């Protein structure tokens, strides 16, 4: 009597999935391309500003004008999106984090500049208040400020 457990080869042999290059590309398990990447960017106030991030070798904080210049290479490489992380000066922070919804805030200006220069580039922004507040806790008292 035939027993499937006694077989020494796989029960499923999907050769048809490997017959042509296009089908192999469609069914392969892992494929990492530029389409899978999001480029994180730390944005600074000012013009022509570039600061290295000491804890992350090779990473820099950029002012909006330099960010727009650098984004040209990202678009050319086919990277579909950037994630903006604003580095807000302490003088612009407050208890309510009002810079988060200020239409002239750093993240908002960077988003507009990138979309004006590269409409096809996705721009992802963080909704956290920590870059905009003087403390990490938001309370009802802060809303009255």
Where are these regions (language model features)?
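Active-site beta-loop-alpha junctions enriched in small/polar residues
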Residues: 44, 87-89, 128-134
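Hydrophobic faces of well-ordered beta-strands that scaffold small-molecule active sites
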Residues: 37-40, 82-84, 123-125
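Short amphipathic alpha-helices and their capping/turn segments at secondary-structure boundaries
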Residues: 22-32, 68-78, 108-119
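Glycine-rich, proline-tolerant flexible connector loops at the mouths of alpha/beta enzymes
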Residues: 51-59, 81-104
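An N-cap/entry alpha-helix motif that binds or orients negatively charged groups
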Residues: 2-65
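Short acidic, glycine/serine/threonine-rich loops at helix termini
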Residues: 94-97, 133-137
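Alpha-helix-loop-beta-strand connector modules within alpha/beta enzyme cores
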Residues: 96-125
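Conserved small/polar residues in nucleotide/adenosyl-binding loops
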Residues: 138-143
């Amino acid at each position: 009597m035939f027993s499937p457990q006694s077989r020494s080869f796989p029960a499923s042999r999907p050769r048809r999935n490997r017959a042509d290059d296009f089908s192999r590309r469609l069914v392969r398990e892992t494929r990492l391309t530029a389409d899978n990447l999001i480029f994180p960017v730390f944005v600074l106030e000012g013009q022509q500003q570039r600061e290295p991030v000491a804890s992350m070798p090779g990473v820099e904080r950029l002012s909006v004008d330099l960010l727009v210049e650098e984004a040209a290479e990202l678009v050319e490489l086919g990277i579909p999106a950037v994630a903006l992380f604003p580095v807000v000066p302490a003088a612009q922070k407050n208890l309510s984090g009002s810079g988060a919804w200020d239409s002239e805030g750093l993240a908002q200006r960077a988003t507009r500049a990138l979309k004006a220069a590269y409409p096809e580039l996705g721009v992802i922004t963080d909704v956290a208040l920590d870059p905009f507040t003087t403390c990490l806790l938001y309370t009802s008292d802060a809303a009255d400020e």
